[in-house]
Regions:
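Loop/turn segments within WD40 beta-propeller blades
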Residues: 50-57, 62, 76, 93-100, ...
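Short coil/turn segments within WD40 beta-propeller repeats
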Residues: 7-11, 45-48, 66-70, 78, ...
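Terminal intrinsically disordered, low-complexity extensions flanking WD-repeat/beta-propeller proteins
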Residues: 175, 204-289
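Canonical WD40 repeat/beta-propeller blade segments in eukaryotic WD-repeat proteins
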Residues: 33-52, 88-95, 125-140, 174-181, ...
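Short loop/turn segments that connect beta-strands within beta-propeller blades
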Residues: 16-18, 74-77, 117-120, 159-162, ...
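Short C-terminal beta-strands that terminate individual repeats in beta-propeller domains
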Residues: 23-42, 79-85, 93, 103-106, ...
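Conserved beta-strand element within WD40/beta-propeller blades
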Residues: 1-5, 60-64, 103-107, 145-149, ...
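Loop/turn-rich, solvent-exposed surfaces of beta-rich toroidal or solenoidal domains
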Residues: 171-207
């Protein structure tokens, strides 16, 4: 398990060890706790996002307030690559679930980037109307992803169409802090917001239909996620520091949804940089004005 903190380091913990006193290893951070002396390849500020590669289990991606994304080899505890194409803090980094070399990032510079780690300067850049809070790949469309914003909107993009989002809808009053796609039923989404609600949505081609909602009594809700092994379970947490587990089968609109066979994502996906993307954020920003 990888844990990011307000420090420029990543803790790696073994879930097989009960009551462990310290992590198995630490990626980056200070050299022997010396002030102002960082390990080679370390982030310089807080770690905001983490993502394990599903194909190469020793590879971890991290995003930071220092505006960089780093790829780590956990076995050697070293940084393999640093990506620095964003211009502001990066709260989101996500490996693609099928194409192991593809990364999704979202930054406070109001840009989402889909890049290939083998050629990180060539990618697809998509502008956002507000700062991002969360993002995740669309399990129903291997070329798509969802991104939530500080203005309470949820947007769905297709990297083959860079002119406009496929879907854009207001889902919360205040920031929409988290979005999760159900892996067994990819058209089922969950969102969480600082308004204290967790909401369930059924995704259509161009709009979302609300299937249910719950005030989970957690204060401002900062995260929600479906449990992959038990896709009817949804976890959420917030400022109350408590954890809420919701069995969404109790929602009338979802009756029978989990009785259907789980859908599978495509085995192979080919990503190419969009025709109007040069790989330079300054150029992309000029085109957005």
């Amino acid at each position: 398990m990888a844990v990011g903190t307000f420090r420029p380091e990543i803790e790696i913990w073994s879930t097989d060890v009960i009551d462990a006193m310290e992590p198995d290893c630490v990626l980056g951070g200070l050299v022997d706790n010396k002030k102002r002396t960082l390990k080679p390849g370390s982030h310089r500020q807080a770690v905001m996002g983490l993502s394990w590669n599903r194909e190469y289990r020793n590879v971890l991606a991290s995003s930071s307030a220092d505006t960089t994304v780093k790829l780590w080899d956990v076995t050697t505890q070293k940084c393999m690559m640093t990506l620095n194409f964003h211009k502001d803090k990066i709260p989101v980094v996500q490996f693609h679930p099928v194409e192991a070399n593809v990364l999704l990032t979202a930054s406070y510079d109001r840009v989402c980037a889909v890049t290939d780690g083998r050629s990180p300067n060539n990618g697809t850049w998509l502008g956002l109307p507000a700062k991002p809070e969360s993002a995740t790949w669309d399990a129903a469309n291997p070329y798509g992803f969802y991104c939530s914003t500080e203005e309470g909107e949820l947007l769905c993009f297709d990297v083959r169409r860079t002119d406009a989002p496929v879907l854009r809808q207001k889902v919360h009053e205040g920031p929409c802090t988290s979005v999760s796609v159900n892996q067994a039923n990819p058209r089922l989404l969950a969102t969480a917001g600082e308004d204290g609600f967790v909401r369930l949505w059924e995704a259509g081609e161009t709009a979302l239909r609300q299937a249910g909602e719950r005030n989970v009594n957690l204060g401002n809700v900062f995260a929600c996620s479906f449990y992959e092994s038990q896709p009817h379970l949804l976890a959420a947490c917030g400022t109350s520091q408590d954890l809420c587990l919701w069995d969404v089968r109790e929602v009338e609109a979802l009756a029978g949804v989990f009785d259907q066979p789980a859908q599978e994502m495509a085995e192979k996906v080919v990503f190419e940089a969009s025709e109007n993307a040069t790989g330079t954020l300054n150029d992309i920003k000029k085109k957005r004005k």
